[in-house]
């Protein structure tokens, strides 16, 4: 019999409570989630529902109260972290480093020689449209450019799993749309597994093949995304597609139902 492929991420009936006291409810309760290798998954939900906590658990930065978490079959937190490139909220660039040296940080942390790391960082910045800013400080870049540099750093780490926490959350609508298109193009050829947290339903649908809704510490919804169905179509055309609008409406209706249920 052929072997069952090992998923990139497996979250098996996981609970997380910061305290056993009954007045402190669990952050996550019986969360079960499997992400096949190469899939792009978006996790949406209201503030405080446990989205970022779930990412930290997957990446080995937190330990669950109960349940099992594996990344590429490994349960040990250090091994899980070794498979993941983490992109926290905000650009998190080091202000005293050049943009190029910021992007090279993951390579330098893994012992890659400085000259080689800088060369690879420069090539990635060229792909990202930031080649002219390689020797600049982060303070000289716009918010969108800093976010693009942070994404470039995460992608240059060349890890099989990318964990992104609100990667475009602090950007204006126009810049967000531009970077969504750019990121979709990069992800299409990367082969990486993406687990992304976002509060933006359009962003979730555009950048993922699957969208799950987290509410009150539980997974309460699961829908197909539109990443594969975009097929190189411009973002504006996809947003105007009646099928996309129907997907958005269904998810927003579920979000609204969650809001009414917890009100």
Question: Where are these predicted regions, by residue range?
Answer:
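Catalytic Walker B motif of ABC-type/P-loop ATPase nucleotide-binding domains
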Residues: 162-165
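Conserved ABC transporter NBD signature motif
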Residues: 67-80, 120
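Conserved ABC ATPase "signature" region
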Residues: 108, 115-133, 185
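The feature captures the beta-strand-to-loop junction immediately N-terminal to the Walker
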Residues: 44-46
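Helix-to-loop junction immediately C-terminal to a conserved catalytic motif
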Residues: 59
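Short coil-to-helix segment of the ABC ATPase nucleotide-binding domain corresponding to the Q-loop/switch region
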Residues: 97-104
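A short, proline-enriched helix->beta-strand linker immediately N-terminal to the Walker B motif
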Residues: 156-160
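Conserved ABC ATPase signature
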Residues: 137-141, 145
């Amino acid at each position: 019999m052929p072997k069952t492929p090992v998923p990139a991420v497996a979250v098996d009936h996981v609970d997380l409570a910061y305290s056993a006291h009954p007045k402190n409810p669990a952050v996550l309760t019986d969360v079960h989630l499997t992400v096949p290798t190469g899939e792009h998954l978006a996790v949406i939900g209201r503030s405080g529902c446990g989205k970022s906590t779930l990412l930290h658990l997957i990446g080995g930065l937190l330990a669950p109260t109960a349940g099992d978490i594996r990344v590429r079959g490994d349960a040990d937190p250090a091994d899980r972290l070794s498979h993941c490139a983490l992109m926290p909220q905000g650009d998190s660039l080091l202000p005293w480093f050049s943009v190029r040296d910021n992007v090279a940080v993951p390579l330098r942390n893994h012992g890659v020689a400085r000259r080689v790391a800088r060369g690879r960082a420069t090539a990635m910045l060229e792909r990202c449209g930031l080649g002219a800013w390689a020797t600049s400080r982060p303070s000289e870049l716009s918010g969108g450019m800093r976010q693009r540099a942070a994404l470039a750093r995460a992608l240059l780490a060349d890890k099989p799993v990318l964990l992104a926490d609100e990667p475009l959350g602090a950007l204006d609508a126009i810049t967000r749309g531009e970077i969504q298109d750019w990121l979709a193009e990069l992800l299409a050829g990367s082969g990486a597994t993406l687990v992304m947290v976002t509060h933006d339903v359009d962003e979730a649908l555009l950048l993922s093949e699957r969208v799950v809704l987290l509410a009150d510490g539980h997974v309460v919804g699961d829908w197909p995304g539109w990443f594969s169905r975009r097929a190189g179509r411009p973002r504006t055309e996809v947003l105007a597609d009646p099928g996309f609008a129907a997907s958005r409406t269904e998810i927003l209706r579920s979000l609204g139902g969650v809001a009414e249920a917890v009100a």
